[in-house]
Amino acid sequence: LAEKEENTNAQAIALTMKALYLSNMTDLFGDMPFKEAFKGIEENIMQPKFDDQKVIYDSLLMDLERANTLYTKTSTIDAKRDLLYNGDVTKWRKFTNSLYLRLLMRVSNRRDMNSAERIKTVFENPSQYPIFESNDDNATLKYSGTRPFVNDFGDNATDDSAMGERFINIMVDSSDPRISVYCNRVSSGANAGGYVGITSGAPASVISKQSADGASNSNNTTFRQYTSPYTFMTYSEVLFIKAEAI
């Protein structure tokens, strides 16, 4: 529809969100249906073949490169329909190129991807590749708290999940101050007052014992409110990429 209407900004946004979600999927699952995916109705492809992860990354990187060239200030984005950046074309373009950096960093150990040179090109050419410059550029979706614009995880519950042991141990061992933002201290049991996680994938008997002793759950005041924002990417991630790549 965006192509039919020659709306290049909408095309660029669509390519950006496609790269965001499909990169998350291939990071989780590796090889997956890609070229033949989403063609069940149009082409009757009910069992799409799996594509190599390199093929997927190459395609997504090209999508982001194309998206960067499609943005234009000669046409506007309807702010009422843009829940992420309220119609700000410049911020969308910054998000596209910052996401481009993330994907390049993901494959930085693959020499054939030439990530180092491509990342350097982005940082050295801000006019051609604008990227996040402050927290004001963060790709953060804010919810009003009124349905349907509510956080899907916003149920205020505190007792239906437990934090993973490895995650908790890493934060405790490094005295990471963000731990109180992510989760709560154990309220009762042998582990009361501390930050303790559950062993992922452990037998039911082990998990039952750990649960009885007490485990930390997610902090419902920060992540599980109906108005809790959802962040896709931040300025701090761009700074980490810059520190590691240059």
State each model region's role.
Residues L1-M17, Y21-I246:
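Structured, solvent-exposed acidic/aromatic patches
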